[in-house]
Amino acid sequence: MSRIGQVFAEKRSRGEKALIAYTMGGDPNLTFSLEIIKTLAAAGADLIEVGLPFSDPLADGPVIQRAGQRALAAGSGPEEVLALIAAARQELSLPLVIMSYLNPILQIGVDEFLRRAAGAGADGLIIPDLPVEEGEEIRVSAAGYGLDLIPLVAPTTGQKRLEKIVGQASGFIYCVSVTGVTGARDSLPAEVISLLQNVKKLTELPVCLGFGIGKPEQIAYIKDYCDGVIVGSALVEIIENYVQNRMEKDKVLELIATKVQTLKSVS
């Protein structure tokens, strides 16, 4: 069983939900980014998504867009993020997933990128702009390297398309809570529960919810309908505040840990 599968199996056996934390690789710089990843793990994150910065991130909200810009300005790119994953893997046993747009992968070459991602210790890959109709090559290659290709589905995804996406998935299903870009929100739309229920009827894979999750009450609202929640912008905002307000590093790491622990307590 893969590391991702093991985490969700353990969570299910204890009646708990997985807390998946997102961070942009190289934000605000590579050295501190590694410290952030280790802090997320120590605070209780069950799985960590590491974003690969890209200049045209269509699915990212303003907070994560700015994180990508900071990472790019600090010299982070595919090579650096793969090295970051490798450094994190030397110290951590939890699953690490790369979230990347398709373009950087194509620039390196699909097979080469997947080979190096697996060699660095990644467990899976999320490609937000990969259409299911064009994903066969990547899906087959990823499986050959032991990498899960984790798809995104939304409330607006049609039923036939949803069935096709879910049928080809591995790792877990990433359900998007809203149509649009990432970012913390005050509330979640009612159709989120319908989406989660629908997806769970179609697959035995874990079903997780992201986009807009950042408050304990949101997790309490939806946790009975999913296997995990994904928190991104609410954590990245803390890093942005560090940069803008010149906070002490230790204080930032403390705030990140507290946020994870607070969300973990209700998951």
Swiss-Prot record:
Pathway: Amino-acid biosynthesis; L-tryptophan biosynthesis; L-tryptophan from chorismate: step 5/5. The active site is at E49, D60. This is Tryptophan synthase alpha chain. The alpha subunit is responsible for the aldol cleavage of indoleglycerol phosphate to indole and glyceraldehyde 3-phosphate. Its EC number is 4.2.1.20. One of its GO terms (cellular component) is cytosol. PANTHER family: TRYPTOPHAN SYNTHASE ALPHA CHAIN, CHLOROPLASTIC (PTHR43406:SF1), TRYPTOPHAN SYNTHASE, ALPHA CHAIN (PTHR43406). InterPro entries: Aldolase_TIM, RibuloseP-bd_barrel, Trp_synthase_alpha_AS, Trp_synthase_suA. It holds the Pfam family Trp_syntA. Tetramer of two alpha and two beta chains. Belongs to the TrpA family. NCBIfam families: trpA. It comes from Carboxydothermus hydrogenoformans (strain ATCC BAA-161 / DSM 6008 / Z-2901). It catalyses: (1S,2R)-1-C-(indol-3-yl)glycerol 3-phosphate + L-serine = D-glyceraldehyde 3-phosphate + L-tryptophan + H2O.
